[in-house]
Amino acid sequence: MKSHIQSLLEQTIESFKQQGILPADFEARIQVDRTKDKSHGDLATNLAMMLTKVAGKNPRELAQLIIDTLPASAFVAKVEIAGPGFINFFINDSALADQLQNAVNDEHLGIKLPTPQTVVVDYSSPNLAKEMHVGHLRSTIIGDSVVRALEFLGHKVIRQNHVGDWGTQFGMLLAYMEELRAKNGEQAHLELSDLETFYRAAKLRFDESAEFATRARQLVVELQSGDEYCNKLWREFNDISLSHCHEVYARLGVSLTRADVHGESAYNADLEQVVKDLDAQGLLTESNGAKVVFQEAFRNKEGEALPVIIQKADGGYLYATSDLAAMRYRSNVLKADRVLYFVDLRQALHFQQVFSLAKLAKFVREDMSLEHLGFGTMNGEDGRPFKTRSGGVVKLVDLLEEANVRALELVRSKNPDMDEETLAEIARVVGISAVKYADLSKNRTSDYIFSFEQMLSFEGNTAPYLLYAYTRVAGIFKRVTGLDLSQAKIVLEHEKEKDLGNKLAQFGEILNRVVDKGQPHVLCAYLYELAGAFSSFYEACPVLAADNDEQKNSRLLLSQLTARTLQKGLNLLGIETLERM
């Protein structure tokens, strides 16, 4: 509905250009918002006030001219001017009912699909050789929810798990294995059963022994040079580490597969060429032995140019080098229209610099959109980054296990007579959903406080509340036998029916915001509001005890659409629904 009003206003703008009211090359930014007070209509725009200067007319006069020029629409019952020049649109109830009727038998719930694009999404991307920790949660689940929404809206999505599968950490592991082999022979391989412990021991040696650190760096060079033994062990380290990652993904219900892994090592062959191409364009400068690029737009507080380091003095490459190679691959090979990077906000400057350099060096097409969708940190209840009591990093698998244990206690307390198998399954879904939803419901760019108590509450904007809301709606249909709604029609008479219908009709515009801005929290807020709108409708409008069959069937269709929208919305967040709680 919102996009329909925007389309009417766009046509009006074009008409103004043809009449000479607006310059032919004028580009208007049309904003249409939902009203909070329904006495002011359903939708409103401040377009008249935005155009008043360029059109040379006062806002109310221009607002009336816009109304007079608007194309006729069956969706609009009336249009009014309010205040200094706001234009309020009142939606036709019968047209809204028709829109909802069309959604009933549509797999996309009546959503008009946008022009499909090829979208590369870079998310999760943990460093290998050690276990995933809570710091990997946000990129993994925010990226996955946006991916799901993009696919639902018809876009071609290419997942890219840009894992850190190269570099110094592998030199440490190789050097440590070398030492163990000297002591224990082939038995040294048994140590790899716990790669995390193996990594910590290697890191300790690296920090304590300069000789060990030198050997580790030498082995990185041998690995990069294609040494057969080093590469065999490297593949083994990666395989063990990736197996752990995918166990976590499976538990989280994340859609990443082994086929989506395209790590740093995938770009090794192109790194030297990246340096040569930058040099050939005269972009490289030598600074303290390193090869760097300075861009005028990036300076520190003292006004000094900030470098993008492409190659270190010792010949090693950095993140910027592999990121540039990846961007070129995503532009030229994957043919991406958009590339989305779900990476910590603290990397904002890095991405601004490499995005700018990629365009400057023509490594990517000018029309390809590069977007860093950064996120804040997950903090403990003390407001500091989430840690164990001893100050260590919290493993993601341990966090999920604790969520499961707490959810089991909660579900058992509410269902003391339920069998253990059913309890365990409900607790699994509730625990994982609570962790994911608590994160996804927060603005992506904000830090947030992690609290099991809040996320497992059945009150407020939480996963347990929404899972229960879904079972409540779906439960209506368990009380009906021989139901046939094939000839039923949606009729919006009661005010609460209209409120619910209006909320259902917003699903498409909400999903477009999710994919345009990478903000799943707007979907969470919408689902919470939808559950509230249904609750108000259900209290005011008897469904199974309606006055007549026509009214009952209409309300059953509204209930069915609500259940489908809640389920689809939760699924797009990567959350399973339950048939009973």
UniProtKB/Swiss-Prot annotation:
Q: Does the keyword Hydrolase apply?
A: no
Gene it is expressed from: argS
The cellular component terms of Gene Ontology attached to this UniProt record, alphabetical and capped at eight, are:
cytoplasm
The family line of this record is: Belongs to the class-I aminoacyl-tRNA synthetase family.
Quaternary structure note:
Monomer.
Q: Which organism is it from?
A: Shewanella putrefaciens (strain CN-32 / ATCC BAA-453)
Q: Does the keyword Ligase apply?
A: yes
Annotated protein name in UniProt: Arginine--tRNA ligase
Question: Where is it mainly found?
Answer: cytoplasm
Which reaction is catalysed here? tRNA(Arg) + L-arginine + ATP = L-arginyl-tRNA(Arg) + AMP + diphosphate
State its location(s): Cytoplasm
